[in-house]
Amino acid sequence: MTIELKPGGLLIAIEGIDGAGKTTLARRLAATLDAAGARVVLSKEPTNGPWGTQLRQSAATGRLSAEEEAELLIRDRHEHVDTLIAPALARGDIVILDRYFPSMVAYQGAAGLPLDELLERNAFAPRPDVLLLLDLPPPTGLARIRARGDAPNHFETQDNLERCRTIFAALELPGKHVVDASADADSVLRQAHAIIVAALADRLSGDAAHTDTGKAALELLSAGRPA
């Protein structure tokens, strides 16, 4: 059985400071939902397009200003929305994003750009139905980065990550759920899956929850919860 969510699909954004486990959760959540019969599109920001590639190079070298990084992020996101996110949602897919516009607000905001202006510049971007904020103390995140053999980049200092964490916590966006990312990866996945199933129940209640197809879809997703 293939689960479709029409109209509009379901947009899930996974956010948090560096080292919080966003990429791990995004991949495992996508695999879990796919196995349950959902149509899942997994993506990330910055993307692998020209603007995103330039941004990752900047993260390694620190050569761009916060304003220049913000401009590249907006260009990258416009292309991402137009070519991948919006079409997938129109098909009724579940879209999972490893970082999205809240990261721009947190990181460029921590660099001194006004938060309200950053949010306004992202008004074109579809708002997530579910925003999973993986909350983690910066020292733990930095320890994880070093443990995987990576050298912290110029964003990944304790002071900067503290500022980013504060901004993430203060962001008031619909669908925001704070997940304790200091727990093990299996526990984080279970927390996230429960949140997604609850969001899907709300989503289906608006259209198909009272049909046999809608009920079967929700039962299938609920049964696929991680052990």
Swiss-Prot record:
Cited SUPFAM superfamilies: P-loop containing nucleoside triphosphate hydrolases
InterPro entries, alphabetized: P-loop_NTPase (IPR027417), Thymidylate_kin-like_dom (IPR039430), Thymidylate_kinase (IPR018094)
Regions crossing the membrane: none
Biological process annotations from GO: dTDP biosynthetic process; dTTP biosynthetic process; dUDP biosynthetic process
Residues making up the signal peptide according to the UniProt record: none
Function: Phosphorylation of dTMP to form dTDP in both de novo and salvage pathways of dTTP synthesis.
GO cellular component terms, A-Z: cytosol
Statement: the UniProt record of this protein carries the keyword Iron-sulfur: no
Name of this chain's protein: Thymidylate kinase
Species, as recorded: Xanthomonas axonopodis pv. citri (strain 306)
GO molecular function, one term: dTMP kinase activity
